[in-house]
Amino acid sequence: MIIFPAVDIKDGQCVRLRQGVADAVTVFSPDPEAMARHWEGLGAKWLHLIDLDGAFSGKPRNFDLIARICSGLSIPVQLGGGVRDAATAAAYLEAGVKRLIIGTLALADPDAFAAICAAHPGRVGVSLDAVDGNLKVKGWVEDSGRTVEDVLPGLSAAGAAFVVYTDISRDGMQSGVNLPALQRLLELTDLPVIAAGGVATLDDVKALYPYGKKGLEGLISGRAIYEGTLDFPAALAYIAEKAKEDA
């Protein structure tokens, strides 16, 4: 199982939001590049990078910064936020992003999403961001009118390589993971799933670990590792030790 440290970029800074609300911002660093290197230095195997400005505007807003982050790391980067056309997807992948997370476009234009998946096999995943099972789009500010159950079969058929599932009500709240919702999602798809929203402590990591055998590829942690309620090196050590036991 992979623990993805999250670096969310807004106005050129590394921030965290609460429940995706644009005005509920905490700035954790004025230097996202340094923060990305920090997590790599602590042992991260992947970086989860989000262009919040892009998510809210629908267009890349931090492209050059993101390219520099990718070039400055030896670990792979997965990126989401504002990827809403084929040209943007191709540009990011050429700039060093290892894989993309697409949400709004995947729901609004499944054919365009399928074309991007076909052009970059294995490198494009779908972001499913939900409140009580109802999916949100455009930076989590609009209701899509659909549920996870509605869209998963089509997205899998379109060629999505993985799913990033965020429980918006728990994002940035450090309130624990919605395990029943995660369990339902894992039962609905054979795609690898990455969970986000609510991871607060090592106990949450321990609670999620058994789901690795059910299709959970990893978890994303943001506020908890920035504020220290989750000790990132300790979480990595726990995962490594459990992997040895299971080998």
Swiss-Prot record:
Any one Gene Ontology BP term: L-tryptophan biosynthetic process
SUPFAM superfamilies the record matches: Ribulose-phoshate binding barrel (SSF51366)
Pathway in which the depicted protein is active: Amino-acid biosynthesis; L-histidine biosynthesis; L-histidine from 5-phospho-alpha-D-ribose 1-diphosphate: step 4/9
Coiled coil (UniProt feature): none
EC supergroup of this enzyme: isomerase
Keyword Amino-acid biosynthesis: yes
InterPro entries hit by this protein: Aldolase_TIM (IPR013785), His_biosynth (IPR006062), HisA_bact_arch (IPR006063), Isoase_HisA-like (IPR044524), Isoase_HisA-like_bact (IPR023016), RibuloseP-bd_barrel (IPR011060)
Compartments, record wording: Cytoplasm
Catalytic reactions of this protein: 1-(5-phospho-beta-D-ribosyl)-5-[(5-phospho-beta-D-ribosylamino)methylideneamino]imidazole-4-carboxamide = 5-[(5-phospho-1-deoxy-D-ribulos-1-ylimino)methylamino]-1-(5-phospho-beta-D-ribosyl)imidazole-4-carboxamide
UniProt name for this protein: 1-(5-phosphoribosyl)-5-[(5-phosphoribosylamino)methylideneamino] imidazole-4-carboxamide isomerase
Any GO molecular function: 1-(5-phosphoribosyl)-5-[(5-phosphoribosylamino)methylideneamino]imidazole-4-carboxamide isomerase activity
Main location: cytoplasm
UniProt-listed Pfam families: His_biosynth
Family of this protein: Belongs to the HisA/HisF family.
Documented EC number(s): 5.3.1.16
Active site: 8, 129
Entry GO CC: cytoplasm
Keywords of this entry: Amino-acid biosynthesis, Cytoplasm, Histidine biosynthesis, Isomerase
